[in-house]
Swiss-Prot record:
Protein name according to UniProt: Bifunctional enzyme IspD/IspF
UniProt region (2-C-methyl-D-erythritol 4-phosphate cytidylyltransferase), positions on chain: 1-233
HAMAP family reported for this sequence: IspD, IspDF, IspF
Region: 2-C-methyl-D-erythritol 2,4-cyclodiphosphate synthase, residue numbers: 234-386
Site (Positions MEP for the nucleophilic attack): 160, 213
Molecular functions per Gene Ontology: 2-C-methyl-D-erythritol 2,4-cyclodiphosphate synthase activity; 2-C-methyl-D-erythritol 4-phosphate cytidylyltransferase activity; metal ion binding
Native organism taxonomy: Bacteria, Bacillati, Actinomycetota, Actinomycetes, Micrococcales
Site positions for Transition state stabilizer: 21, 28, 266, 362
Binding site for 4-CDP-2-C-methyl-D-erythritol 2-phosphate: 240-242, 266-267, 288-290, 361-364, 371
Residues annotated for a divalent metal cation binding in this entry: 240, 242, 274
Domain of life (superkingdom): Bacteria
Amino acid sequence: MCTASRPRIAVIVVAAGSGTRLGAGSPKAFVTLGGRTLLERSLHAVRCMREPAQVVVVAPEERLAEAAALGEAGFGAAVDVVAGGETRQGSVAAGLGALREGVEIVLVHDAARALTPAAQFDAVVAAVDAGGAGVVPGLPVSDTIKRVGADGEVRETVDRSVLSAVQTPQGFPRDQLVAAYAAATTDETDDAELAAAAGHPVTVIPGDARAFKITTPWDLRRAEELLAGLAAPRIGFGTDTHAFDPSAELWLAGLRWEGEPGLAGHSDGDVVAHAIVDALLSAARLGDIGGVFGTGDPRFSGAHGEVFLTETRRLVEEEGFRIGNVSAQIVGNRPKFAPRRAEAETLLSRVLGAPVSVSATTTDGLGLTGRGEGVAVFATALLLAP
């Protein structure tokens, strides 16, 4: 969620289109898909971006209040809303006029690309940062493309190896996009064309098949079918075991336990957090904690369990799920967990935005935990469609 008062990134979400080809009788961004409008679904991805962003929604003038309410519902916080222009280009120009001081990178996104994952937004930002120029996501063209005359006669077969079907969000350094719009003398089909016409380089990076534009009734049915595949609840299981390390501090269930021996590990050794992460990743079919947060990544050396849980929640939500509930059971002789159970459950529930229950037991002296050599945790997680 965007919480920074002066974010360096802004996302302009264009939601002013009439939706004539969709035939829904209302502007396209306000059409419902699986119980939520296209605008809400588009903003959900923005909410899951790694870095906070200012959000500017460009909507029809007569629906600004509705756009503000839907924007807050989808983004989870208030968004800036401005009236659109006569054309898409005019609408984006209106959005540019609402950018706050301090914004350095601008992403322009079509609300009609409602299933675009947050990872695509993050990839565009990273590419703009790396290259200092415009970036658009695109997919290879798989169909054979013919150039035809007005009479329908084929004039040429275009080499599809040099073609890319571009998507949004399209990202640019703010100064370049503002300059391109100021210099525009004709309406172009997208922002990348405007930037290129103004002499600014634009690079294509790999896009995502889910970022297709919902323009026709067939597109809407396709999106509904994709969402239907996410509708069934997902259950994941995770486990983790760490040996005691008397030289380390003990972190367990997000809490520091003074006077107790710590657990060995690349991070803080919080086995409760790690088992929950594995359960969530398993339910979302995202792999496991080792594959996602490998021990070779210095960003997570010594990191607390809350860091892993926060990022895992973001990844799960990026895939289109919400966390239903989580249950974890600690197996070990120490520490005595019952006195701090409520404290741990409150912290974990806050981090994950869902109910978390934690219980504890022993193995009556059997095995590694029974001998007092370490702690094991088993966790289950339930994921639901948003």
